[in-house]
Amino acid sequence: MTKDSLFSRPQKPVPPFEFNASVVEVFDDMLNRSVPCYRELIHRQAQLAAHFYQPKTRIYDLGCSTGNLDLAICSAMDAARPFELVGVDNSEPMLKVCRERMRETPPEANISFACSDIRNLEMSNASVIILNLTLQFIPPADRQNILNRIFQALVPGGILLLTEKTVHAHAGLSELQQDFYYRFKAENGYSQMEISQKREALENVLIPETMESHRKRLDQAGFKAVDTWLKWFNFASFIALKEKS
């Protein structure tokens, strides 16, 4: 695993963050050092995917990046249990790594990949859809339509697993959460310059919202059974169930 040092040198101006080949090379280290509870998140989501998967349906991983969750899902599925998994990302460098990692997958796994903007992706017959740290990079005006289409693509009894970086409606609590997040990154070896430059690079690229905004949007899409199953300061992971009629 290559260490993330993308922002270890002064950059003027700091370019906007993008998922290019340089980021892909260090992405796994970046995730482990920048996303609180990342390993637990992936481990439990894979178990949830295996639990809710219905025969002859699909699992979609929207924003699959380098395939960490997809590998975990393959491990979590019962032996000799056929399943279909579709990994989607709009970064071809990410998908290149993901495809390589998924070459030695179980024979019962039908795995495919699509290099696509999820706003244009056609989805259907899904029992599990995962949207990890992806919606936050989509313009807010487009987010409701994506969730509407996810709800329509799910079969009854299917689930959406949504993880996002969030902000708090209360300014003081939002600042507290940010401070503890930067403390977390510093404890994982990032310098103050790296933290500052990464924050600048993400400005207007990653646009977080409140948990209330996410819940309202999920409700409008049709999800009436929603829970926050994992939360760490300004990171939250939701499970949204499309109930059987």
Swiss-Prot record:
<comment type="similarity">
    <text>Belongs to the class I-like SAM-binding methyltransferase superfamily. Cx-SAM synthase family.</text>
</comment>
<feature type="binding site">
    <location>
        <position position="199"/>
    </location>
    <ligand>
        <name>S-adenosyl-L-methionine</name>
    </ligand>
</feature>
<comment type="subunit">
    <text>Homodimer.</text>
</comment>
<dbReference type="InterPro" id="IPR041698">
    <property type="entry name" value="Methyltransf_25"/>
</dbReference>
<dbReference type="Pfam" id="PF13649">
    <property type="entry name" value="Methyltransf_25"/>
</dbReference>
<feature type="binding site">
    <location>
        <begin position="117"/>
        <end position="118"/>
    </location>
    <ligand>
        <name>S-adenosyl-L-methionine</name>
    </ligand>
</feature>
<comment type="function">
    <text>Catalyzes the conversion of S-adenosyl-L-methionine (SAM) to carboxy-S-adenosyl-L-methionine (Cx-SAM).</text>
</comment>
<feature type="binding site">
    <location>
        <position position="132"/>
    </location>
    <ligand>
        <name>S-adenosyl-L-methionine</name>
    </ligand>
</feature>
<keyword id="KW-0949">S-adenosyl-L-methionine</keyword>
<keyword id="KW-0808">Transferase</keyword>
<feature type="binding site">
    <location>
        <begin position="63"/>
        <end position="65"/>
    </location>
    <ligand>
        <name>S-adenosyl-L-methionine</name>
    </ligand>
</feature>
<feature type="binding site">
    <location>
        <position position="38"/>
    </location>
    <ligand>
        <name>S-adenosyl-L-methionine</name>
    </ligand>
</feature>
<dbReference type="GO" id="GO:0002098">
    <property type="term" value="P:tRNA wobble uridine modification"/>
</dbReference>
<dbReference type="InterPro" id="IPR005271">
    <property type="entry name" value="CmoA"/>
</dbReference>
<dbReference type="GO" id="GO:0016743">
    <property type="term" value="F:carboxyl- or carbamoyltransferase activity"/>
</dbReference>
<protein>
    <recommendedName>
        <fullName>Carboxy-S-adenosyl-L-methionine synthase</fullName>
        <ecNumber>2.1.3.-</ecNumber>
    </recommendedName>
</protein>
<dbReference type="GO" id="GO:1904047">
    <property type="term" value="F:S-adenosyl-L-methionine binding"/>
</dbReference>
<dbReference type="InterPro" id="IPR029063">
    <property type="entry name" value="SAM-dependent_MTases_sf"/>
</dbReference>
<feature type="binding site">
    <location>
        <begin position="89"/>
        <end position="90"/>
    </location>
    <ligand>
        <name>S-adenosyl-L-methionine</name>
    </ligand>
</feature>
